[in-house]
């Protein structure tokens, strides 16, 4: 008979699996409580969550949500990291943590219901983050607007230059005519 706590854990895992875009499965052996806290903080900053769960409860939740592809990754001490929004930022946070003295061993993960190995996650880390994509898009949108402003301003500038040149040529022509008339009048 399952305990109330196990039922709640399965319900929580099911909710996380339904919301996630990517789940990373890792072995956390060798990490101290301080290391785990640091990792959780880094992941929270990237909009993700890091939980330790029993494999049997994780498997029950996975089967009930259609994520049974995760089963081969559930062996030994297992931690799950769930990314809900900015996946490249999430994977970069894991890679950044793993550059330190303590590391988690990434076994693989899920994108939707598709199983991924750790090499694919490294590729995802090389993708631009949501903020970087926004900056690129805004930069791409601003360039044509700047060009359009130049195109719109060019005819106005040309007209001003033409009028300026025309008024100067009229003045030069009038001055030349006055100069012509003055010597003949004397």
UniProtKB/Swiss-Prot annotation:
InterPro entries named in the record: Ribosomal_uL10, Ribosomal_uL10-like_sf, Ribosomal_uL10_bac, Ribosomal_uL10_bac_type, Ribosomal_uL10_CS_bac
Keywords: Ribonucleoprotein, Ribosomal protein, RNA-binding, rRNA-binding
GO biological process, one term: translation
SUPFAM superfamilies (UniProt xref): Ribosomal protein L10-like
Family label: Belongs to the universal ribosomal protein uL10 family.
Job description of the protein: Forms part of the ribosomal stalk, playing a central role in the interaction of the ribosome with GTP-bound translation factors.
UniProt-recorded name of the protein: Large ribosomal subunit protein uL10
């Amino acid at each position: 008979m399952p305990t109330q706590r196990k039922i709640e854990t399965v319900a929580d895992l099911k909710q996380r699996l339904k919301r996630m875009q990517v789940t990373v499965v890792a072995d956390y052996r060798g990490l101290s409580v301080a290391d785990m806290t640091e990792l959780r903080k880094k992941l929270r900053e990237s909009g993700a969550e890091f939980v330790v769960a029993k494999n049997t409860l994780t498997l029950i939740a996975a089967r009930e949500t259609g994520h049974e592809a995760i089963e081969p990754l559930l062996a030994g001490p297992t931690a799950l990291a769930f990314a809900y929004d900015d996946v490249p930022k999430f994977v970069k946070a894991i890679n950044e943590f793993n550059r330190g003295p303590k590391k988690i061993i990434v076994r693989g993960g899920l994108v939707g219901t598709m199983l991924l190995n750790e090499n694919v996650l490294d590729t995802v880390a090389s993708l631009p983050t949501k903020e970087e994509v926004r900056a690129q898009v805004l930069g791409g949108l601003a360039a044509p607007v700047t060009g359009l402003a130049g195109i719109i301003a060019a005819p106005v500038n040309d007209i001003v230059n033409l009028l300026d040149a025309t008024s100067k040529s009229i003045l030069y022509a009038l001055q030349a005519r006055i100069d012509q008339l003055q010597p003949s009048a004397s």
